[in-house]
Amino acid sequence: LFGGCLFSMRAAVKEEIYVNHIADTVEIGNEFLARKFLVKNDKVRTCMIENKRMGKEVSRIIPETISEDFIIRTLSADSVVADIHSSDLFLQRVQVTDEGKNGKKLVFHYKGFRHQEVDWQVDMVLTLEEGKHYMRKYLEITVPDSQRHLARLDYIDFEPMSLPEGYAVWTHPVMEQGVGGVSGYYISLGQPVYIQGMFFGLEFPASETEIEGDRKVRIRYYSGKSFEMLASEGRLADSGTFTTWKEVTGATRSTDMDVIQTDFFSYIHDISVPVDFRIQYNSWYDFMLDINENNILDSFREVERGLTQNGVRPIDSYVVDDGWNAYGPWQEENKAKFWSFNSKFPNELSTPSDLSHRLSSNFGLWLGPRGGYNYYIKFARFLEENGNGKLNCNSSDICTNHKVYCEKLKMFFLDCQQRFDVNYWKLDGFLVRPPQPD
């Protein structure tokens, strides 16, 4: 089972990552945390997750035996659901390799199996980097090329643990009313959960992560896509393997909420992309929808004059907000039957773009993918009538995942990018409610 792999005993050097195989257990860890698996009768399950950051008091999570390491829910061609439980799979072999700089990768290769007329191959992968207080877990899933159209993922549960009573836990509050017109459900997506001074989450911003009744953990990624669709989107490797988003398990120094959040944000700092401070002018604050070429040019000049006189460097972008599209009162002018420029901009945006660059700055542009905020219902119907999009009947706006709409929007972006040298896009509003089924 463990042929071809070398398993080191717990490292003498504190910072070294180790993978141990002792009797019926396999453990991966470092000085901050560890995860131990019971491997018996070709079955694998997590038997302990350990937090070593709390000083002398080591904190351990011992999942109930009914817990799973993952559940994959699939959909057949006629939408019949069926689940693949990690506990139902048989282990073929375990592999340990180096990962990155002084990191380790632990892979549980399961034996292939047939499920809903599809031949599946699933691997569970864990990675741990040197000096990090968190580790990652993800799946690699493969099906034959000829069966991709049959293999459809409904969702994946990454950590379906059942917890013993009395554990210190936190999950997001119920926010039924939402904020600012956005539902509480959407706002809560992507939040971590805290268990015994450890944080758990998925590196996907719209994951459904929560603890039900203080006992049942859910870290769920909804897909709804077949492997054929994933291949068309470039989500499969050359080998045909789909690599899921990565689940993260992190150790903190206390069960105190402030400390947990501090250590969680330390992880966020590690993965975040640096954001540079930008100075911009946006036409919305002066004119809202009442922009035209003349008042835009006047504003650009006035802003530049005032800032220069006060020693401010050239700003990063002059941005034209809503009011340029041929919809609402200007829809009859719309010959493109798509996003296009109304008669208030006879030169489209060439003149404002040219001025922004002559002011030693750059040009930015607004677009609301779901149809903006004032004329979205009528505009969505207009696009659908002309074969350039689809009305989302559940939210009375544009379906932002419609293939024709997305392709035409991409071409519009590229055209504006080239002709107006856009360096900043304000993409305003993507989704209110999922659309009706086709």
Task: State what each model feature region is.
Residues F277-R278, Y285-L289, E293-N294, N362-F420:
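Active-site-adjacent "subsite" loops/lids of carbohydrate-active enzymes
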Residues F32, K36-L38, I49, E64-I66, ...:
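Carbohydrate-recognition beta-sandwich/jelly-roll modules
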Residues E304, S350-S360, G368:
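Surface-exposed amphipathic alpha-helices with a cationic face
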Residues L1-E15:
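Bacterial Sec-dependent N-terminal signal peptides
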Residues F277-Y281, D316-V320, F363-L367, W425-L427:
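Hydrophobic faces of well-ordered beta-strands that scaffold small-molecule active sites
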Residues P274-F277, S317-V319, G323-P352, Y376-V404, ...:
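Aromatic- and acidic-residue-enriched carbohydrate-binding clefts of CAZyme catalytic domains
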Residues A23-Q116:
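Acidic-aromatic substrate-binding/catalytic surfaces of carbohydrate-active enzymes
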Residues R313-W324, K410-P437:
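Active-site groove signature of glycoside hydrolases
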